[in-house]
């Protein structure tokens, strides 16, 4: 069972909240008013997975063995930006409960196993708990009929706004770390080939 449905619902709630802020109205979703508690739960759902995998990547890169080649007793077959990409991909995969890694990363170490297990546990269950609290909060609210200022969640405007919100949150979350790994490697190879 995946977590894509409640992840997308969290982004839909964030979109409704942002739209409500832009027009100065209390945000509503499926006839329920969205309050601060709901937004805290949405933030947990959206931010826990990237924070866990980025924190695990950062902690792993601090260890000297994560900066050395395997021939020198390290965990990487490549150093630099590609080595960083290997570590980032391993934890991204663990956060998605896939468990794959680049062949150049020695993933079967005590640190990687403990960090990976912790990442999998936190990324899977913390958002689930937040979703349960969010569902309880929404279920306990009275239905409010849609007014003239309510953003219809079936409109193309909402879909476009949702896509923009997902792209902005994704870019703000991952663009800095992608600049250190895959993008840096791309531009390095571009410079070498050019």
Predicted region positions:
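Hydrophobic alpha-helical transmembrane segments
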Residues: 43, 115, 159-163
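Pore domain of cation channels
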Residues: 1-20, 104-138
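Final/C-terminal transmembrane alpha-helix of multipass membrane proteins
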Residues: 50, 157-179
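P-loop potassium selectivity filter motif centered on the GYG triad
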Residues: 1-3, 70-122, 177-194
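Juxtamembrane and boundary regions of transmembrane helices in multi-pass small-molecule transporters
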Residues: 132-143, 169, 177-179, 183-184
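Membrane-embedded translocation segments of transport machinery
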Residues: 1-28, 32, 36, 40, ...
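Alpha-helical transmembrane segments
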Residues: 21-35, 133-153
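Short helix-terminus and kink motifs of transmembrane alpha helices
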Residues: 16, 20, 24-28, 132, ...
